[in-house]
From Swiss-Prot:
Its EC number is 2.8.1.13. Its main location: cytoplasm. GO terms for biological process: tRNA wobble position uridine thiolation. InterPro entries: MnmA-like (IPR004506), MnmA-like_C (IPR046885), MnmA-like_central (IPR046884), MnmA-like_central_sf (IPR023382), Rossmann-like_a/b/a_fold (IPR014729). Belongs to the MnmA/TRMU family. ATP binds at G16, M17, S18, G19, G20, V21, D22, S23, M42, G132. This is tRNA-specific 2-thiouridylase MnmA. The keyword Heme does not apply. It comes from Shewanella denitrificans (strain OS217 / ATCC BAA-1090 / DSM 15013). Gene3D superfamilies: Adenine nucleotide alpha hydrolases-like domains (2.30.30.280), HUPs (3.40.50.620), Translation factors (2.40.30.10). Disulfide bonds join C107-C205. The keyword Disulfide bond applies.
Length: 372
């Protein structure tokens, strides 16, 4: 069993209980550390009576069972209105504009570490909040805090949390960030928690098990158009640019073509003006590669950000291998990033997150690409 030295005895922590194993073990570990722990379950999506996909009821039941087992209070709160206004509307607007958004990042920014923290403060009188994210917090001698990658490199979630402010990190605890995933499941099993073997949630929470294209079509009208090669040859039809992202290989519906080789086809560009999807063969096709990018809507955890001309590493998507790069500031809210070597399938609308070693510095939204 993992033992962690008691700290901050008696301080009150409100744990975001999702009904999953990570938040379950987070609550247990914080109790072991001497905190006064209570759970708070968020309902972020209002499904209708015919919605078979949302597991919120099951998750609530599991969260309550864990809190009962641990002997702690559990509260519930409905953030569906805030979620719709601040996460879902953004999600739709980005897809409508031809970009590929990341709603999980926006959910962390607007709901889990904003609305949740405000509720925990105003209603539950919290000293801290805690989540089951795989990141670490470092407390420095000067009173500052930093956000670090989780110990489990395969589960590290710092990419999704780069928008957190210094103040939010200072008010947040991340117990499972110090552990490997298998250790978390082992602890849950030893404690007899119902969530010990529960499958990890994947995908976008409000879509659940639904087919993504079907879900999106209920909110945004599809606009079919041509699929072209870089040379302008029409080789197929798409059902809507919003259903495709740069670097996509599957689901293009392109069969064997006369005079083409057997290399797979990849999306290399979305021509919004003409409503044309441009595809090319080979994962290293020049049209798929970028030498760099511009990034705007910047957010730095320490508020200052790195110095211009800093040598850092960046992730342009979750679980991507670190990409060495150099950054320069065009203005306080825009940087130019040059990669040490070309990178495939960098996607406007997605987040670029920067690191100095294990420290997550922050990041921003990919705006445009720099081609060779």
């Amino acid at each position: 069993m993992t033992s962690i030295k008691p700290i901050h005895n008696g301080k009150k922590v409100i744990v975001g209980m999702s009904g999953g194993v990570d938040s379950s073990v987070s609550a247990y570990l914080l109790m072991q550390q001497g905190y006064e722990v209570e759970g708070l379950f968020m309902k972020n999506w209002e499904e209708d009576d015919t919605d078979e996909y949302c597991a919120a009821a099951d998750d609530l039941k599991d969260a309550q069972a864990v809190c009962d087992k641990l002997g702690i209070k559990m509260h519930t709160v409905n953030f569906a209105a805030e979620y719709w206004d601040n996460v879902f509307e953004y999600f739709l607007a980005e897809y409508k504009a031809g970009r590929t958004p990341n709603p999980d990042i926006m959910c962390n920014k607007e709901i889990k570490f904003k609305a949740f923290l405000e509720f925990a403060d105003d209603i539950l009188d919290a000293d801290y909040i805690a989540m089951g994210h795989y990141v670490r917090r470092r407390d420095n001698s000067d009173g500052s805090v930093q956000m670090l990658r989780g110990v489990d490199g395969n589960k590290d979630q710092s990419y999704f949390l780069y928008t957190l402010s210094h103040e939010q990190v200072a008010r947040s605890l991340f117990p499972v960030g110090e552990l490997e995933k298998h250790e978390v499941r082992d602890i849950a099993k030893q404690m007899g928690l119902i969530t010990h073997d529960k499958k990890d949630s994947t995908g976008i929470c409000f879509i659940g098990e639904r087919k993504f294209t079907d879900f999106l079509a209920t909110y945004l009208p599809a606009q079919p158009g041509d699929i072209e090669t870089p040379e302008g040859e029409v080789i197929g039809k798409h059902q809507g640019l919003m259903y495709h992202t740069l670097g996509q290989r599957k689901g293009l519906g392109i069969g064997g073509l006369k005079d083409s080789n057997e290399d797979p086809w990849y999306v290399v560009e979305k021509d919004l003006l003409r409503n044309v999807l441009i595809v090319a063969q080979g994962g290293n096709h020049p049209r798929l590669m970028s030498q760099g990018m511009t990034v705007n809507q910047l957010h730095w955890v320490d508020r200052k950000g790195p110095a211009t001309d800093s040598q850092l590493v960046v992730k342009t998507r979750y679980r991507q291998t670190d990409v060495p790069c150099r950054i320069s500031f065009d203005d306080p809210q825009r940087i130019t990033v040059i990669f040490d070597s070309p990178v495939a399938a960098v996607t406007p609308g997605q987040s670029a997150v920067f690191y100095d070693g294990d420290v997550c510095l922050g990041g921003g939204i990919i705006d445009s690409l720099i081609r060779g």
